[in-house]
């Protein structure tokens, strides 16, 4: 079993710049980091409901992945991490799909301990832009990277920003609201394809800082993932289950100010040519904060 198989799992099982969390997993956890503290949101009058709209903010996204796989009596573990500096710009007016939106990657800095081949790809990323639409619920759809090859080379940590923004009801959300969504997504990249079906439960409560109102959105979800592809020319299939929790802070004007998400996924990778199955555990954590 080669270390590259770990990266295939990462690319398939991870959502974009969103981690998922769940019960404790056997993978070695990443070193604890300082909890995300949302900065004061910009002054804005409180609205009847919070929803997304035009605006631009620069973010620091810290993403950490810990992956463990077992083959026979051998256990392989790998930790990946990076700090991603990205600017999100939402413009109007919206069309039938959503608001025209770009995510511009200014730079990516690998955490210490990230394997050299991955770190080398990461530092090459400059001015990579994803253009698409932000739908009313917050999904980033119809995304197209400015450099497909470059985007694919860092897909393990970067994803495609589909779930960067917390998912909200289409007509916005008010304090005290609760809602449930079922979301199905398909991700394709290179020789790999995966599908994910998630059930998401969310609640919104009032949040106030420095006299400015906003919302704290708590989410939990369970999901099932399946996929297939080729690793070093050899076919594989995967399936598994995962759980996730997250917290997001939204200003009253709809700006995403901070968030933290954690997930745990247990997968089985089947290698039909070799006739073996490999259990894999992946734990991911993503912290988002606004930069000045």
Where are these regions (language model features)?
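Sec-dependent bacterial lipoprotein signal peptides
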Residues: 1-14
């Amino acid at each position: 079993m080669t270390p590259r198989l770990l990266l295939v799992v990462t690319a398939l099982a991870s959502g974009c710049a969103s981690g998922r969390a769940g019960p404790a997993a056997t993978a070695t956890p990443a070193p604890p980091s300082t909890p995300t503290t949302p900065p004061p949101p910009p002054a804005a009058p409180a609205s009847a409901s919070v929803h997304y709209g035009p605006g631009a903010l620069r973010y620091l996204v810290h993403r950490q992945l810990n992956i463990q796989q077992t083959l026979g009596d051998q256990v392989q573990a790998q930790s990946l991490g990076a700090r991603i500096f990205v600017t999100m710009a939402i413009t109007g007016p919206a069309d039938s799909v959503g608001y025209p939106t770009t995510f511009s990657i200014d730079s990516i800095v690998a955490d210490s301990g990230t394997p050299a081949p991955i770190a080398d790809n990461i530092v090459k990323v400059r001015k990579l832009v994803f253009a698409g639409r932000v739908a009313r619920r917050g999904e980033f759809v119809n995304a197209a990277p400015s450099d497909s090859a470059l985007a694919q080379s860092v897909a393990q940590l970067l994803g495609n920003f589909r779930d960067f923004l917390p998912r909200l009801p289409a007509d916005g959300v008010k304090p005290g609201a609760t809602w449930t969504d079922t979301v199905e997504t398909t991700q394709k990249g290179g020789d790999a394809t995966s599908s994910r079906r998630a059930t998401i439960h969310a609640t919104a409560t009032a949040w106030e800082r420095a006299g400015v109102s906003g919302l704290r959105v708590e989410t939990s979800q369970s999901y099932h993932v399946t996929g297939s592809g080729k690793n070093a020319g050899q076919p594989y299939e995967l399936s598994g289950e995962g759980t996730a929790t997250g917290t997001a802070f939204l200003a009253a004007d709809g700006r995403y100010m901070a968030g933290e998400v954690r997930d745990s996924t247990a997968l089985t990778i089947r290698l039909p040519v070799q006739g073996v199955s490999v259990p894999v555990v992946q734990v991911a954590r993503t912290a988002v904060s606004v930069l000045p």
